């Protein structure tokens, strides 16, 4: 499947807000729901809405995954010890799909999503560079962002 980069649309923010509201009703109150990825920093991309769900402890990831799979999400193959990936479609459609990343709040994987999002929001020129070189640049920008934290 070829990757099609689309222009940014404010409808992605609306869709995130609606899905966050729906998820908030399904999930425990001690979790965090954050908008991350290119749509969170107002740049184009694959028209995917990345949602970061922060859980208090690593052991909580499975229960959140189970709730989401019972409510329309599919487990993806890009899982790690400190992150579970789910999507609301089995294959990317480019029509505002949701990708959910479940991570423990106090672990590096969670912090990296937040650091990268905030760095790109505050550095529009880097955000455009990120859009062009997404995969290779992501790790580099996380390191830069960590070194420029106040």
Where are these regions (language model features)?
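Conserved catalytic core of two-metal-ion nucleotidyltransferases
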Residues: 71-107
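Short histidine-centered catalytic/ligand-binding loop motif
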Residues: 5-11, 52-53, 116-120
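Short amphipathic alpha-helical segments
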Residues: 1, 47-51, 96-98, 116
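Short amphipathic alpha-helices in soluble, non-transmembrane regions
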Residues: 63-71
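Active-site nucleotide-donor binding segment shared across nucleotidyl transfer reactions
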Residues: 23-60
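Helical scaffold of the NTase/Pol beta-like nucleotidyltransferase catalytic core
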Residues: 1-34
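Catalytic cores of NTP-dependent nucleotidyl/adenyl transfer enzymes across multiple folds
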Residues: 108-150
């Amino acid at each position: 499947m070829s990757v099609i980069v689309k222009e940014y649309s404010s409808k992605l923010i609306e869709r995130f807000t609606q899905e966050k509201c729906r998820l908030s009703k399904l999930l425990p109150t001690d979790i965090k729901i954050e908008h991350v990825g290119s749509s969170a920093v107002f740049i184009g991309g694959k028209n995917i809405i990345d949602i970061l769900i922060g859980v208090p402890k690593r052991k909580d990831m499975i229960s959140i995954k189970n709730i989401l799979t019972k409510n329309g999400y599919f487990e993806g193959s890009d899982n790690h010890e400190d992150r579970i990936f789910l999507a609301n479609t089995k294959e990317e459609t480019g029509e505002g799909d949701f990708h959910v990343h479940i991570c423990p709040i106090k672990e590096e994987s969670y912090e990296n999503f937040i650091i990268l999002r905030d760095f790109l929001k505050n550095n529009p020129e880097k955000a455009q560079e990120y859009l062009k070189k997404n995969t290779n640049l992501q790790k580099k920008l996380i390191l830069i962002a960590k070194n420029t934290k106040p």
